[in-house]
Amino acid sequence: MKLLSGLLLCSLVLGVSGQGWFSFIGEAVRGAGDMWRAYSDMREANYINADKYFHARGNYDAAQRGPGGVWAAKVISDVREDLQRLMGHGAEDSMADQAANEWGRSGKDPNHFRPKGLPDKY
């Protein structure tokens, strides 16, 4: 636990890089909200083959907030995938999820992963 806390703190300090703390933290909080909204939409949609789209969309929306949002999206995505691996989900699917996460975080259009027929609401 101490190691994880230390890594998160160091990651946060390095992520700020001269930018104001309050701005960075605000971006991170709003970015985490974007990630939660994408996750909630994914659960609500319950649409086959849509998970990569929601991964990319959550990361994209969070990254649009700024460096704090990028940081939050990366931390949340990495922790989620690590937990999935620990619970026995396939490494291949995890790698595909991480590719979608990075796609969105880098500012690329998440609709690249949007499956045909997914309701316009999402």
Curated annotation (Swiss-Prot):
Record GO cellular component, one term: high-density lipoprotein particle
Record GO biological process: acute-phase response
Region (Disordered): 90-122
Presence of the UniProt keyword Zinc in the record: no
Known tissue expression: Expressed by the liver; secreted in plasma.
Keyword tags: Acute phase, Amyloid, HDL, Pyrrolidone carboxylic acid, Secreted, Signal
One Pfam family matching this protein: SAA
Modification Pyrrolidone carboxylic acid occurs at: 19
Role this protein plays: Major acute phase reactant.
Assembly: Apolipoprotein of the HDL complex.
Name of the protein described by the UniProt record: Serum amyloid A-2 protein
Biological source species: Oryctolagus cuniculus (Rabbit)
Lineage: Eukaryota, Metazoa, Chordata, Craniata, Vertebrata
